[in-house]
Amino acid sequence: MMDVNEIRQYLPHRYPFLLVDRIVEINLNDSIIAYKNVTINEPFFNGHFPNHPVMPGVLIIEAMAQAAGVLGFKSMDKKPEDGSIYYFVGADNARFKRPVVPGDRLQLEAKIIAEKRGIWKFECRATVDGQLACSATIMCADRKI
């Protein structure tokens, strides 16, 4: 398990763009389970949508990518402070199955499916109460900064 203070050691993101609150399970070189608590206080709800708040799909994908980023960094035994960054370089087959709204706990799952020359590919899912909200294949690149 990792709390937000430890997560911040592995992700360069900060408020309002840190979208992982806790890691509940991590299996190095394999998979991760994390979550994001979605509250009405999220800044994006001011405009998306004022009378019917829904978490933007691109931010659900970003949350999955951040969870995958923690898995990648931990699997490589690296941190951003070591001069490495994990760029989000692509998403394939993204599908949205249900809206994510204030009060939801978004569970984020990522599984490594390939790694070659610093390009990592993950099969990702985001669920709420066991219901699929989003799925995508996400690619990230480990690069020196």
Curated annotation (Swiss-Prot):
It is found in: Cytoplasm. GO terms for molecular function: (3R)-hydroxyacyl-[acyl-carrier-protein] dehydratase activity. It is an enzyme of class 4 (lyase). CDD domains: FabZ. One of its GO terms (cellular component) is cytoplasm. Its EC number is 4.2.1.59. InterPro entries: FabA_FabZ, FabZ, HotDog_dom_sf. The active site is at residue 48. Its main location: cytoplasm. It catalyses: a (3R)-hydroxyacyl-[ACP] = a (2E)-enoyl-[ACP] + H2O. Keywords: Cytoplasm, Lipid A biosynthesis, Lipid biosynthesis, Lipid metabolism, Lyase. Gene3D superfamilies: Hotdog Thioesterase (3.10.129.10). It holds the Pfam family FabA. It comes from the Bacteria. Involved in unsaturated fatty acids biosynthesis. Catalyzes the dehydration of short chain beta-hydroxyacyl-ACPs and long chain saturated and unsaturated beta-hydroxyacyl-ACPs. Belongs to the thioester dehydratase family. FabZ subfamily. PANTHER family: 3-HYDROXYACYL-[ACYL-CARRIER-PROTEIN] DEHYDRATASE. HAMAP family: FabZ. This is 3-hydroxyacyl-[acyl-carrier-protein] dehydratase FabZ. It comes from Marinomonas sp. (strain MWYL1). The gene is fabZ.
